[in-house]
């Protein structure tokens, strides 16, 4: 059987958000790795939601380790924006709360230097019999605040069902 990855019909805004992140990661990796490979964007299901995913891989040179690579990439536009320095300064000035566990990376780290990492976009912290859900939404010039809010609520339902 031939398995094909398909990008289901996604709104243009969602595809642009994915491309911002892909372009950023590829441009950063191209400065420190060789043979960067990028898949076509495709759709994956997580809980009840569909997401756009792009696989990106490369081989680190002798002078680059995983810690340096993460420092180079984090935060990605998925959680900060572009251009990164301007977006980060805006967030620091206007957001008004500690993002705590909202973002970071997670995945497999192994001694064979073949790691498989993901940007953490949603998570939950349970502390003192309280659950705190962390999620966000992609804000672009084409964003509709009502739709973004509904998207965040829908994203939270996946974790809320666990509780």
Where are these regions (language model features)?
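Conserved hydrophobic core element of enzyme catalytic domains
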Residues: 56-163
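Contiguous alpha-helical scaffold segments within structured protein domains
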Residues: 4-92
């Amino acid at each position: 059987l031939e398995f094909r990855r398909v990008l289901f019909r996604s709104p243009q805004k969602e595809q642009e958000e994915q491309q911002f992140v892909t372009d950023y990661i590829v441009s950063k990796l191209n400065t420190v790795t060789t043979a960067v490979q990028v898949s076509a964007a495709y759709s994956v299901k997580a809980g009840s939601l569909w997401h756009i995913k792009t696989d990106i891989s490369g081989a680190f040179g002798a002078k680059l380790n995983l810690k340096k690579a993460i420092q180079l990439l984090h935060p990605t536009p998925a959680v900060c924006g572009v251009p990164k320095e301007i977006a980060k300064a805006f967030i620091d000035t206007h957001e008004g709360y500690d993002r705590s566990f909202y973002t970071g990376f997670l995945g497999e780290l192994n001694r064979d230097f073949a790691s498989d990492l993901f940007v953490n976009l949603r998570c939950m912290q349970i502390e003192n019999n309280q659950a705190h859900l962390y999620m966000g939404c992609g804000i672009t010039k084409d964003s509709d605040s009502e739709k973004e809010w509904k998207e965040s609520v829908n994203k939270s339902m996946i974790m809320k069902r666990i509780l």
